[in-house]
């Protein structure tokens, strides 16, 4: 019987996916799993739950397309238009995964949360169900953060109450239409879910397969969110919450420099596996040899920096990116790892002028990234130069993880003045700081279905 219940649930999900997650449909009575193992099986399906958008990778400055001909040959209009920050990213393309995939995660999470909460009332809540409840809350928070940062304006503490966010869905049914909430309301839901998840998640160490949410993953996500919000004291607080429990780094001297898949997706540094959707131009090891790593970024790596040979393939002076912390997966890694959290911590230390501690923490990271015996300790002399050094290390370490776009947005809100530029033939395309081009369009088929407000771009 349990298998039939699960099958019915999955069929209902697939039906909902094909019609769009915010579309009003006539009948949404859904049979849902009733046992802990069924819930866990759904949450473990990484192709359905936890997938994040890849538009931030397509729009960021970590790569270039060398010729206009190659750009025109991109597989989709979305790839072409994201590259030049066109007003209409999707060019008429429908069923955009950057919008649909996070809402699919929300849909799964809402159904699991609802069913587990029914069992709260009976008092028959096993430790496994408590952990599953925490995992579902985590996934809903992660999905909403992905949506609100991609489809709303860059976060601003002063305007968050009037800035338009994304539709919030907490009810498991799918037969009603939601309008867009404020950015503040979206972030409130995210924090409520994560704080509640921390009381239910069972594990505060990484699990062997690195595929399930833990307290560590919640700490990492909270640190990432607060960094994006430029609330550096809280970003550091949650970075510490993780690093005080788990802080393993990989010694890159022990990693193959010649393998195209130098890492496994269960490596010691990993907190939780996570992948994005995929386009050909965002895929790792781009088989068409048309997408190359930004040359300015490549020049940042010193000769003894092992990341140059471990992260990239040198194709006659042009570099392509290897597969990363997703192991053999082709999509960009957007999960959680110790290196990101440590860099969050270091940046926060610099911002509160704890330069000595910041330089020691940076040394710990870079001793594991340079050839043995070649790294020279960098003593930070002043806050400005220290911050510049740390932000450059973020670029070098966290490449191809869909984090650079979010960093540009938050840094430009602080006046960094980063201007993005692309050249195709005789045409030069630019994206100025704090302009509407940093907000992605909502797919037009979603606008047509639900009538929600489109973004100005």
Where do the protein language model's features map onto the residues?
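Conserved, well-structured interaction surfaces
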Residues: 78-151, 181, 198-202, 329-336, ...
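Inward-facing hydrophobic residues that define packing positions of alpha-helical scaffold repeats
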Residues: 106-109, 187, 194, 239, ...
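Sec-dependent bacterial lipoprotein signal peptides
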Residues: 1-16
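Membrane-proximal, proline-rich intrinsically disordered regions
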Residues: 17-65, 239, 307, 373, ...
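Extended ligand-binding clefts on enzyme/binding-domain cores
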Residues: 36-40, 46-47, 51, 185, ...
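Short, surface-exposed recognition loops and adjoining beta-strand edges that mediate ligand/DNA contacts
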Residues: 28-33, 59-74, 153-162, 203-280, ...
């Amino acid at each position: 019987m349990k298998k039939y219940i699960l099958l019915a649930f999955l069929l209902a999900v697939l039906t909902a996916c094909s019609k769009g997650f915010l579309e009003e449909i006539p009948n949404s009575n859904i049979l849902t799993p009733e046992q802990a193992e069924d819930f866990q099986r759904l949450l473990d399906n990484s192709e359905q739950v936890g997938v994040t958008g890849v538009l931030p990778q397509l729009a960021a400055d970590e790569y270039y397309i060398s010729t206009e001909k190659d750009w025109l040959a991109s597989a989709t209009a979305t790839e072409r238009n994201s590259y030049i920050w066109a007003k209409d990213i999707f060019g008429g393309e429908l069923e955009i995964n950057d919008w649909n995939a996070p809402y699919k995660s929300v849909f799964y999470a809402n159904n699991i949360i609802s069913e587990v909460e029914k069992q709260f009332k009976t008092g028959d809540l096993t430790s496994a169900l408590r952990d599953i409840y925490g995992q579902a809350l985590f996934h809903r928070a992660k999905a909403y953060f992905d949506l609100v940062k991609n489809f709303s304006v860059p976060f601003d503490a002063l305007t968050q109450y009037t800035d338009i966010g994304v539709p919030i869905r907490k009810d498991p049914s799918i037969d009603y239409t939601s309008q867009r909430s404020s950015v503040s309301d979206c972030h409130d839901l995210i924090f409520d879910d994560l704080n509640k998840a921390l009381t239910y998640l069972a594990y505060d160490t990484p699990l062997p397969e690195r595929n399930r949410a833990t307290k560590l993953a919640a700490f990492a996500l909270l640190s990432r969110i607060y960094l994006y919000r430029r609330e550096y004291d809280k970003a550091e607080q949650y970075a510490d919450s993780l690093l005080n429990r788990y802080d393993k780094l990989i010694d890159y001297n022990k990693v193959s420099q010649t393998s195209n898949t130098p890492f496994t997706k269960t490596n010691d540094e990993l907190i939780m596996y996570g992948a994005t959707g995929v386009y050909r131009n965002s895929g790792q090891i781009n088989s068409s040899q048309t997408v190359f790593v930004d040359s300015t970024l490549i020049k940042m790596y010193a000769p003894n920096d092992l990341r140059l040979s471990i992260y990239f393939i040198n194709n006659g002076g042009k570099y392509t990116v290897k597969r990363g912390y997703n192991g053999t997966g082709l999509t960009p890694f957007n999960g959680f790892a110790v290196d990101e959290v440590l860099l969050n911590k270091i940046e926060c230390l610099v911002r509160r002028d704890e330069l000595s501690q910041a330089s020691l923490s940076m040394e710990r990271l870079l001793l594991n990234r340079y050839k043995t015996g070649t790294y020279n300790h960098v003593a930070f002399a002043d806050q400005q130069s220290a911050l510049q050094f740390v932000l450059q290390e973020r670029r070098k370490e966290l490449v191809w993880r869909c984090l650079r776009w979010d960093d540009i947005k938050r840094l430009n809100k602080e006046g960094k003045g980063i201007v993005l530029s692309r050249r195709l033939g005789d045409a030069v395309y630019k994206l100025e700081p704090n302009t509407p081009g940093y907000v992605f369009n909502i797919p037009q088929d979603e606008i047509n279905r639900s009538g929600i407000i489109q973004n100005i771009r």
